[in-house]
Amino acid sequence: DCLDFGFMEQMRARTSAKKQDFWLMGEVIHGDYARYIGDGQHLLHSVTNYELHKGLYSGHNDHNYFEIAHTIRREFDENGGIYKGKKLYSFVDNHDVDRLASKLNVKENMIPIYALLYFLPGIPSIYYGSEFGIEGRKEGGNDDPLRPALNLEELEKNPPAEKLPAWIKTLSDVRKKHPAARTGRYRELMLTNRQYAFARLDETDALI
């Protein structure tokens, strides 16, 4: 571990005293994510969900929604999910892994993948530029291709994935409108290798 747990606890106390909504997120690749969050009041607010990241793209490449659903069931199931009630940081790509558009066999699968990112349990995040569907792969040990300078005006006019920016905006609007999409319970409804239906629900709202 890079950070001492006592240090994280002191950092949480001091930052919260300075600014109540100061948010602490950690990058954790392996191990028990819950260790770094604890009860949610004394350590970090969230950590990266690398386990889900892998399934989101490989489950589509392999036509295997069972992989994604198994991860979510293990992590967030109503009856015994090991991270139930915790808010993990969900992502499809970041500064250390290949861009989603470069990992997919079928680029159109970015549409359902971003829907899952926004509505499965977790805090959805978008790595800069990926909202346009740009590509990027590591070259050996060089991460520079993952972290390019971007011409936003050009990308807004001609995004590589034409439908993706508007789709992500729609997903964001729905998530903002419905609290159940953010904090509701997760319930699996139907699952085959190519079909996956689930609900997010609370006392007043439900989304399927």
Each model region followed by its residue ranges:
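Active-site-proximal helices and loops of the catalytic beta/alpha 8
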Residues: 1-83, 107, 116, 133-170, ...
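Hydrophobic, well-ordered secondary-structure elements that form the walls
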Residues: 95, 117, 129, 171, ...
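Structural preference for beta-strand elements that scaffold enzyme active sites
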Residues: 21-25, 87-90, 124-125
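Conserved interdomain hinge at the start of the Helicase C-terminal
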Residues: 110-112
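Acidic/polar loop patches that form or flank catalytic/metal-binding clefts of enzymes
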Residues: 25-26, 124-129, 179-185
